[in-house]
Amino acid sequence: MKELKIEQWPVERLRPYGRELKVTDKALPQMVDALRQWGFRIPLLVTGDGEIVDGKTRYRAALELRMETVPVIVA
């Protein structure tokens, strides 16, 4: 079994999954506020080449906040 570890990756290394789900108008501002207040509580789940499997709203909120790096778990 592969050991999972949290890494910090630059946001420009990431890209949303091909079949994007729509982020609701309410979800993004709420996530921006949560990241601003508490930071990342749950890392993004990404593939080795940076495709986001889980965490698109967190990713978009990080872009809004102009974060340079985000925590990820590589699946």
Residue ranges and their predicted role:
Residues 1-75:
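Short, charged/polar connector segments at secondary-structure boundaries
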